[in-house]
């Protein structure tokens, strides 16, 4: 039996208001997607019934849609998933409640679910409403600490098929004291390694410095750990690619997010790049420290 050919590559873009959904939609349009924003859910099946337009489609869906509700959206996802003509991906553009509230207060906009109440009430209401949809997402991007430029770059790695033919990898370091980043596929705890913080000459430096990396590498446990880590990730990447994933996110944590996690993320990122994989590196706590000294107008969020 010949299986039907998939005629539509369809990306449903949703997420809480203020998280960056509009930025995501615009970025996908720049990549060549046919973009339709705020299309009523009941119209989506009719769109698929029509002739193929020859390029991927991105649909923006949020609580402002005329007939939006989470149950109807999940039913639509199930229906499209079962349609052999459709290659469906669900992109959920997420953000922490505290950051969403900050953005609303900064712009003085009213929340669509709480026009006569505080933004905090609308944000919490919308997060609860979208919770069942969030767990169905194929791709989750947390924009809490992203600028619009960061979001566009992340989307390019995931959805711009012309930009790369291999699975893209992002590695990031973080501090456990500030919480585990959301949207990370695999997390590795680096707190068992020797801590350069206790060496006065290294304390003010970070894991990108050769002297810090050398100190961490001198830990007898480092070499076998890193060899196993590199081999594991290099083993998993082709398997993830075969499963249709376009992106894999790896997180490395330590106490302060300055030395050990940064060094390991840097070293693994370099090793994967040498093996031919597209890699992006991010150091959350170092970015926070750098952002603290920038003028306020440079801190625009997605």
UniProtKB/Swiss-Prot annotation:
Displays ATPase and GTPase activities. It comes from Cereibacter sphaeroides (strain ATCC 17023 / DSM 158 / JCM 6121 / CCUG 31486 / LMG 2827 / NBRC 12203 / NCIMB 8253 / ATH 2.4.1.). ATP binds at residues 15-22. Belongs to the RapZ-like family. Keywords: ATP-binding, GTP-binding, Nucleotide-binding. SUPFAM superfamilies: P-loop containing nucleoside triphosphate hydrolases. The keyword Plastid does not apply. Pfam families: PapZ_C, RapZ-like_N. Gene3D superfamilies: P-loop containing nucleotide triphosphate hydrolases. PANTHER family: RNASE ADAPTER PROTEIN RAPZ. This is Nucleotide-binding protein RHOS4_02640. The keyword ATP-binding applies. It comes from the Bacteria. InterPro entries: P-loop_NTPase (IPR027417), RapZ-like (IPR005337), RapZ-like_N (IPR053930), RapZ_C (IPR053931). NCBIfam families: PRK05416.1. GO terms for molecular function: ATP binding; GTP binding. GTP binds at residues 62-65.
């Amino acid at each position: 039996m010949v299986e039907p050919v998939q005629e539509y590559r369809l990306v449903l873009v949703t997420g809480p208001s203020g998280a960056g959904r509009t930025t995501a939609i615009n970025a996908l349009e720049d990549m060549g997607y046919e973009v339709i924003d705020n299309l009523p859910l009941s119209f989506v099946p009719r769109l698929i019934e029509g002739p193929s337009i020859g390029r991927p489609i991105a649909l923006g869906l949020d609580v402002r849609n005329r007939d939006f509700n989470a149950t109807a959206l999940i039913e639509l996802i199930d229906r499209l998933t079962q349609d052999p003509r459709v290659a469906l991906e669900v992109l959920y553009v997420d953000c922490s409640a505290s950051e969403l509230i900050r953005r609303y207060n900064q712009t003085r906009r009213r929340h669509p679910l709480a026009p006569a109440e505080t933004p905090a009430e609308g944000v919490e209401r919308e997060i609860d409403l979208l919770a069942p949809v969030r767990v169905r997402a194929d791709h989750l991007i947390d924009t809490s600490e992203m600028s619009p430029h960061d979001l566009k770059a992340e989307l390019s790695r995931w959805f711009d098929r012309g930009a790369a033919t291999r699975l893209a990898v992002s590695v990031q370091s973080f501090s456990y004291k500030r919480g585990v980043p959301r949207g990370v596929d695999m997390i590795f705890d680096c707190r068992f390694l020797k801590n350069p913080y206790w060496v006065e000459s290294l304390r003010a430096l970070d894991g990108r410095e050769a002297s810090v990396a050398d100190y961490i590498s001198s830990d007898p446990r480092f070499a076998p750990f890193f060899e196993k880590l590199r081999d594991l990730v290099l083993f998993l990447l082709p398997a993830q690619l075969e499963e249709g994933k376009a992106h894999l996110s790896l997180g490395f944590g330590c106490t302060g997010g300055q030395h050990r996690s940064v060094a390991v993320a840097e070293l693994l990122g370099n090793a994967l790049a040498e093996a031919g994989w597209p890699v992006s590196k991010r150091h959350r706590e170092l970015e926070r420290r750098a952002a603290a000294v920038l003028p306020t107008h440079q801190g625009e969020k997605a």
